[in-house]
Amino acid sequence: MEKIKIPKATAKRLPLYYRYLLILNEEGKDKVSSTELSEAVQVDSASIRRDFSYFGALGKRGYGYDVKNLLSFFKKILNQDTLTNVALIGVGNLGRALLNYNFKRSNNIRISCAFDINKEITGRILSGVPVYDMEDLKQQLSDQQISIAILTVPSTAAQRTTDEMVDAGVKGIMNFTPIRLSAPADVRVQNVDLATELQTLIYFLDSEKEN
């Protein structure tokens, strides 16, 4: 399927649509309206119609969207038939939680290897995932052809580890550290800062109290 260039905001919403369509399909529903989708995924219906418009005519005016057809389409767009192996770098408290989770509700993503400096866990299998020593990082990432990694190392090691991952061919990094990483233009970094997100939530709640 030809790659379609879409806005980043649209790309982030596609998995939301796909997950809800899975639910509808399991319930045996044949069609869904943009209004129903809007209420379920908390995205306004105008944005949904605009998102879908990037892919051509996916629905019919007055009818809505065929659930099976839409599900099949987004399955291809999101590569749901292709298994993506992801590396976890750093097996501390957050890393262990991610290992235990390991995208169990996803059919196409899995953490296939993990790395840490702790000799008590390296060389072992945790939650079904082999944990390697950080000294083996570049070799294993290259040998296993891993292109996506989750980074949960201490801040002091974040940039150094990133440089090693990039050298090994990693092209996508989900960064859970508070450090803003420096990476080549062809490497995409997605920052996940839980503390910042919570602080933002607290700010908005406090603002609503004042009003």
UniProtKB/Swiss-Prot annotation:
Domain of life where this protein originates: Bacteria
Keyword Transit peptide in record: no
Gene3D superfamilies reported in the protein's UniProt record: NAD(P)-binding Rossmann-like Domain, Winged helix-like DNA-binding domain superfamily/Winged helix DNA-binding domain
Residues annotated for NAD(+) binding in this entry: 90-95
Subcellular location: Cytoplasm
Keyword Transferase in annotation: no
GO MF entries: DNA binding; DNA-binding transcription factor activity
GO term, biological process aspect, one: response to redox state
Primary localization: cytoplasm
UniProtKB keywords: Cytoplasm, DNA-binding, NAD, Repressor, Transcription, Transcription regulation
InterPro entries: CoA-bd (IPR003781), NAD(P)-bd_dom_sf (IPR036291), Rex_DNA-bd_C_dom (IPR009718), Tscrpt_rep_Rex (IPR022876), WH-like_DNA-bd_sf (IPR036388), WH_DNA-bd_sf (IPR036390)
Pfam families linked to this entry: CoA_binding, Put_DNA-bind_N
DNA-binding region(s) in UniProt: 16-55
SMART domains named among the record's database cross-references: CoA_binding
GO cellular component terms, semicolon-separated: cytoplasm
Family label: Belongs to the transcriptional regulatory Rex family.
HAMAP family reported in the protein's UniProt record: Rex
Purpose: Modulates transcription in response to changes in cellular NADH/NAD(+) redox state.
Subunit description: Homodimer.
Protein name: Redox-sensing transcriptional repressor Rex
Organism encoding this protein: Lactobacillus acidophilus (strain ATCC 700396 / NCK56 / N2 / NCFM)
Lineage: Bacteria, Bacillati, Bacillota, Bacilli, Lactobacillales
